[in-house]
Amino acid sequence: MLCGGSRASVHLWDHRHPPRLGAKVLRKSSFMLRPCSAISQQRIKSSFRSHCKTPRKIPAPLDCFSQGDDHPELSAEGLSPVAGGIVALGKFDALHIGHRELAIQAARIGTPYLLSFVGLAEVLGWKPRAPIVAKCDRKRVLSSWASYCGNIAPVEFEIEFASVRHLNPQQFVEKLSRELRVCGVVAGENYRFGYRASGDASELVRLCKDFGISAYIINSVMDKNQVSVNTEEEDSKSKERGQVSSTRVRHALAAGDVRYVTELLGRPHRVISRTRTQDLTSKRGRISLQTSSLLNLPPGNGVYKACSLIVGDKHPISCKVIVDTSNLYIETEEERFHNSDESQEFQLLGIEFG
């Protein structure tokens, strides 16, 4: 077996202190880690689905797309793309500091992967909504986590939700063990899985033990306020603060609280726009974009200072951004906007808030 048939070991990581960049305030339980076989110590080759596919002729901000799309192949033994690895479980919509903490713990044990599901909205009939992180920008974010993860950028591996929706908790863990051949899993204390979310973290631990893989559960990551005291004098924003979550990020974006968004994400929020070159207009340092050109969720209507515009491989340009219902305006001190390549039909621009 990939994990040497070792009995599952369970660890609880405590995060009662607010996380800081580079901080690793942890409390580990007394259980001992049983090491997996040597295969889990290697960088397992993967044929994971690419997250940065764009039409060939579309240029892009350098740090968003130019890192190159790695397409590692399956090993000669035909192993699963995540075989022998430590898999973090979650939805990973926002790639916030709570998600990063899962990746950090996975990297402490072995080769880190993020296992997420695609197609949930279509299967469950949810109303379509813009992602928090543009799909083409996810690799950049994960690469920025390498410094927290032993200089290894976590790899994101996707599974079609329709293919696992019907699985009960036991069948799901069996898939992780026997089909995907993972060595261990990391999940948050509120993680739910299986058909109709019938399984919880404690059942995950029990089932992983039954199937001979390790399970690691971490406490919820809280924002800097940690605990919200609900009083009548408390404003609506402070009532919303507490556990870091993708929902909280969406609420903060809608409220235009980009400082709080930066805290939750552990980085400034970046919006990517895909616009026809001929539609990019600049008058006296003012660039106008239609919100329909945005590939991910912008902050709510308002004026945002201390922003940055990223164009191709050029240095970020300081700017002010005005967001309204149908347009996004970028104001810079440069009188004229220089396209990275005017021969291209489309331009991809990055706008960073805060």
UniProtKB/Swiss-Prot annotation:
E.C. no: 2.7.7.2
Origin: domain of life: Eukaryota
GO BP terms: FAD biosynthetic process; riboflavin biosynthetic process
Subcellular location: Plastid, Chloroplast
Pathway recorded for this protein: Cofactor biosynthesis; FAD biosynthesis; FAD from FMN: step 1/1
Signal peptide span: none
SUPFAM superfamilies: Nucleotidylyl transferase
Any one Gene Ontology cellular component term annotated for this protein: chloroplast
Keywords: ATP-binding, Chloroplast, FAD, Flavoprotein, FMN, Nucleotide-binding, Nucleotidyltransferase, Plastid, Transferase, Transit peptide
This protein's name: FAD synthetase 1, chloroplastic
Lineage per the UniProt record: Eukaryota, Viridiplantae, Streptophyta, Embryophyta, Tracheophyta
